[in-house]
Amino acid sequence: MTETKGYFGQFGGSFVPEPIQNLLNQLEETFEQYKNDPEFIAEYKHYLKDYSGRETPLYFAESLTEHLGGAKIYLKREDLNHLGSHKLNNVLGQILLAKRMCKTRVIAETGAGQHGVATAAAAAKFGMACDVYMGAEDVERQRLNVFRMEMMGATVHAVETGTRTLKDAVDAAFGAWMADLDAFYVLGSAVGPHPYPTIVHEFQKVISEESKRQILEKEGRLPDYVIACVGGGSNAIGAFSQYVGDEEVKLVGVEAAGHGLDTDQHAATMTKGTVGVVDGMKTYAVFGEDGKVAPVYSISAGLDYPGVGPEHAFFKDSGRVEYVAATDDEAVQALLLLSKTEGILPAIESSHAIAEAVKRAPQLNKDKIIIINVSGRGDKDVAAIADYLEAKAAK
């Protein structure tokens, strides 16, 4: 897709204070210098293969397919990456840029903790100091990931302001960056000011580069659907990237409907949001009546973000991607279904995408093919799911 510098259609741009803009210009310069550099690419691919364990399998979910009785379902197994999610794809790329910029300290925000864990690991690997900002609410929900980050030498800062979730962690991380302009900000999703959405796309496109090759090997044709969950949107951008030009492939992004789209307890930016500026970018976001970013909710700490990446906003308006939403309950049921039919425990974020496939597959012919991007594994969610089911049973 043609991108006017920093924009996807009307979306994107860079709405930040001047000191940050100067850093973004340096980052863009470094990225442009190295993104096609054979030595940089070789080093990046080396770490993807030998450190992260790529490529990840494209797995035919035979039992789930039989259970649903419709389209063939394949799972792109990003949960099998080192550390359990797609996040490391992007972090390795950004850390290698940081290294070339001679940075010694990295800052990151995290929601579910997966990006924080990936950043902590890469910082440990390359001998960098690491500070991770995480909403206090998410610290409680994702205690396991907090310990993982700390074990790898990162300092985790619990953010008590606002809704104490991902949006507040992003704000705090930007604040910390303003206070130490020599640090490198490793942004975890395809959001924020230019050039971050473009950089994250570049380092996540490996997902669909692999899945496209793999499905052609297995089925001799492209899929009919690719489905991925959308919070900020990095796993979905990676999963969709190489199919955007293939009009016959339907792309479906699944947001968090929380307690329902008719409540104020959701994070369905595309369905319920309007266009505005949030976190340095012009995109869709959920705003309150006062014009400020509204609190959002999801059982999933990785999806409760009130904005969305500008490239997704562009895909919505152009009609290339269909955006839908799944409730907490639908996501939990999908998580349990995949666990019981395939012995694969997906992250609660990924389970939103699985929930949509569960709705669609039975309505499709058996010769249709769906690829679901399983963006992460669900070990981190076991306690929260147990609490959810217990509370539901008590009602």
Regions found by a protein language model. Give the residues of each.
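Positively charged, low-complexity intrinsically disordered leader regions
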Residues: 3-12, 25-103
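A short, small-residue-rich loop immediately preceding and capping a beta-strand
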Residues: 82, 98-135, 222-235, 251-254, ...
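Claisen-condensing/thiolase-fold acyl-transfer catalytic domains that form or cleave C-C bonds
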Residues: 230, 234, 328-387, 391-393
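Active-site nucleophile and cofactor-binding loops and adjacent substrate-binding regions
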Residues: 77-88, 106-115, 162-163, 204, ...
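Short glycine/serine/threonine-rich phosphate/pyrophosphate-binding segments
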Residues: 88-94, 108-126, 140-143, 229-240, ...
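Active-site/ligand-binding loops adjacent to catalytic centers
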Residues: 170-195, 245-248, 253-344, 387-395
